[in-house]
A protein has these predicted regions:
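Rossmann-like AdoMet
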Residues: 1-104, 110-155
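Rossmann-like AdoMet/SAM-dependent catalytic core
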Residues: 2-14, 224-298
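Glycine-rich phosphate-binding loop signature in dinucleotide/nucleotide-binding domains
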Residues: 94-99, 171-177
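Short, conserved loop/helix-junction motifs that constitute active-site signature segments
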Residues: 117-122, 173-175, 203-207
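S-adenosyl-L-methionine
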Residues: 142-175
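A short, conserved alpha-helix within the catalytic core of class I
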Residues: 152, 163-166, 189-205
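A short SAM/SAH-binding and catalytic strip from SAM-dependent methyltransferases
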Residues: 173-193
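Conserved beta-strand signature within the Rossmann-like core of class I S-adenosyl-L-methionine
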Residues: 204-220
């Protein structure tokens, strides 16, 4: 696994916008064809990003962008959308059924769920990310909504060098209430030590807390099985050197148990596609190198 000095945190920070840009473009599809609904995503962008979002109102250009994405990274279009849809549903479920009133989003990027989901408006939330992403997002949210929601606290961090617990405590998160943790598209960008450090933090969560996270497959990161994703391996692992860590699906349940969590679901993107893409009638690829986990603190 990568050592501490080889982790390019700036490179990881630059990936925070793309998922939400894809979500914004998705809103230009007819309503019955959309994989996810998000009326805020497009409002976060200006300049060239907004230009590309706007021109995809033209169907031929919209389909061209989707097809180009799928050509280089099969499943690369739908992966952002289905995982966000899944997390949205688990969050709403946790708030309404499990009475969870606290949320921590580690690696929040430009994600909009805290600002668009009605169920999330009255919970106490902390969004944690690199300073450059936090600052840009605050400005974008203030511009889109007129002010920044008082129930959301933004927390800047370096996931490699800093302790999550200490940083959150300084911003008012005490960790004494059941919490919904989101760890979306973070683990591959850090090293094994930082992953374990994150789970050391998760292990202290109150019983009944929920955790949802994505992970890239270990054999892909190691180059043992590329799953038809040669371009992605060349770019993310070899060239840009921003993907460092992967989990083995056969070991994920034991790893969770060791850290005080019970696996609820470890799901691949083929099944997520059946849930969220198939009903739209669209035919999109499947990202076989990533999976989604949902767990409960025990």
């Amino acid at each position: 696994m990568a050592n501490k000095n080889s982790i390019k945190t700036k490179g990881a920070a630059k990936t925070g916008d793309q998922p939400t840009i894809n979500v914004a473009i998705e809103q230009n599809f007819p309503k019955e064809q959309r994989i996810i609904e998000d009326n805020l995503a497009a409002q976060l962008y200006s300049g060239m990003n907004r230009f590309w979002i706007n021109i995809t109102k033209i169907a031929i250009l919209r389909n061209w962008i989707v097809n180009i994405t799928e050509k280089f990274l099969p499943g690369g279009w739908s992966c952002f959308l289905v995982r966000k849809r899944y997390i949205d549903e688990r969050l709403i479920e946790s708030i309404t059924e499990n009475k969870i009133k606290t949320l921590v989003n580690l690696g929040a990027g430009s994600d909009t769920r805290l600002y668009r989901l009605s169920e999330a408006q009255n919970i106490s939330a902390w969004e944690v990310d690199q300073a450059v992403n936090i600052d840009a997002k605050r400005k974008a949210i203030e511009k889109a909504l007129g002010s920044f929601p008082s129930n959301v606290k933004q927390v800047s961090i370096n996931f490699i060098d800093e302790e999550i617990e200490d940083v959150l405590k300084r911003h008012g998160y005490l960790g004494n209430e059941k919490t919904f943790f989101i760890w979306e598209a973070v683990s591959q960008y850090i090293n094994e030590a930082a992953v374990q450090k994150t789970f050391d933090f998760f292990s202290k969560a109150p019983v009944g807390s929920r955790l949802v996270f994505t992970y890239v497959l270990k054999d892909f990161i190691k180059g043992e099985n590329l799953y038809g994703q040669e371009w992605g391996y060349e770019k993310f692992v070899l060239k840009d050197k921003i993907w460092h860590f992967g989990f083995d699906p056969n070991q994920i349940e034991a790893y969770l148990n060791k850290n005080g969590w019970k696996l609820i679901e470890d799901i691949d993107y083929a099944e997520l596609g059946d849930r969220y893409v198939k009903p739209t009638g669209r035919s999109l690829g499947v990202l076989d190198i990533e999976r989604m986990v949902y767990a409960e603190k025990i």
